[in-house]
């Protein structure tokens, strides 16, 4: 950690953002750094007097599309020091599952592996645990990758779909942020890239992963997870301690993560799955294809402006599955499916501030709603679960797979998933 400390010693430091990572940064600095001053700020970047500080360490949720040499991040500082012993994992979907599976497999192969990063473990919290034998499996978001100088020695870029367009505006800018995980590598590095990822100028040794080359036995649902397993297998083979049998055993034994197509209850002979991590149409479609006998799917959340044509077509093509639409994206998808309405004309107060009211209702009483027979439209998750309970037949499954972010309605996808579980498990009389 010496280079990190030397960059911060005798500096006037501002921590910009005080969530989980901001607090982690504060703890690290107070423990290890000889600083001139240390301030914490939560607010608009326009309110920062940059002349007062030598270094500004921002949280990943604060997106800056332009470079400013005073600004840095945990990720940038960490990779500057530990890039040579880091395996970075990015992609629109599957980052957490692949990272956790890889860490599990490496440990089974006798490698000392630390799982850090966007999975909810700030890297500064674990620096004291790193020694010469440690390998870091680092889940990396687009925000973390946007401003880095050095890339991980081994990079995984799983896939690319439309996401975070509320920040980046275009898919090209979003891809540029992600691509830094490879474009900043050197000739001695390795990268593994999904087949739908656009070309990236690179110096490292690259392998394209298009389909599973082995018949993986998994304890988690989804054909897409066999692709994730293929990435894990290929990376694990780089380690001299890893042989095929041990790698395959570790992949098979991996139990998955919460809120990722997680089966959690059977009530009145209906199986319930929490796929709250789903924030794009492709994830929702994969979820439905991965579960047997799907009776109902709850879709909707914050609208980031991504394209939902593929999901609208999927809903039309699956007439035997009930799709319960809610929140902003649910309303937008309903319009794509034929629901005619004037913006802000239906329950504008309740819809505009859903989480600050106890209102629970639906649009089903409106006459002449020209939606397909397999679609229901409602306001929020509370009523969506009620509709699912009323309309999902015994022997079938109900999936929460929103195809949209939780922000504006819940703190994060974890809170949304936990709330879904509570609604499912509570009795109607509660």
Residue ranges: model-predicted function:
Residues 28, 112, 221-321:
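Nucleotide phosphate-binding/pyrophosphate-handling subdomain across enzymes
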Residues 31-46:
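NAD(P)-binding Rossmann-fold cofactor-contacting core
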Residues 12-27, 31, 276-367, 381, ...:
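Active-site beta-alpha connecting loops in nucleotide-dependent enzymes
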Residues 1-10, 45-48, 77-79, 262:
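A short, basic/flexible loop-to-alpha-helix module at the beginning of a structural domain
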Residues 72, 192, 208-210, 326, ...:
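Short acidic-hydrophobic, aromatic-tinged amphipathic segments that line or gate anion-handling sites
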Residues 27-30, 46-55, 60-195, 199-207, ...:
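Phosphate-binding loop of NTP-binding sites
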Residues 12-14, 52-55, 112-113, 186-191, ...:
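Short active-site oxyanion
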